[in-house]
Amino acid sequence: ANIDIQTTGDMTNSGAIVARNALNIDAGGTVTNRLGDISGGNVAITAVGDVLNQSGTIRGTDVSVTSTTGSVINETLTQDVTVYGAVGSGTNTVMGATAGISATNTLNIDAAKDIISRGAELNAGQDANLVAGGDIKLTAIEQKNYSASRTYTEANGYTTIEEHTEQTTKQVGSTLNVGGNLTAK
């Protein structure tokens, strides 16, 4: 079965839109896939505004994502949370599901402005064509981790207190996997 969604305004998905064959989304505003799944045989998403894939999945045999006046942003969502330990406080980053736009065969992404993949995945089993009027950016996101401990040791009537705190930050990068030719311009 085919699915054809047309709207003069914005379209937001946070569930599952699954087509056995063709899946077409045409929006006069922004298309947002937040924590959702958009999948089918041939998937074509066109928006006048931005196309935002936020910790969601867009996948199909052939996938085409187009923003005629905006950007295509594929990003893994994060949230920093303050945690309190035995010794002070720090920040932990809660990571959402890894965002991904994937095609078994050909992946086409076309944006009037930028193509941005932030801590996310772009996959093409065959060729990938990334065309941006602005920049193409594959960037990392920060994942922070805080830990703290306090240890008490008693010996010969004395108490020794050891305190340890650690705040680490690592970069979680974006990936671009292409089985065939890559065109980026």
Which residues fall in each region the model found?
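Binding/recognition "hotspot" determinant
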Residues: 1-185
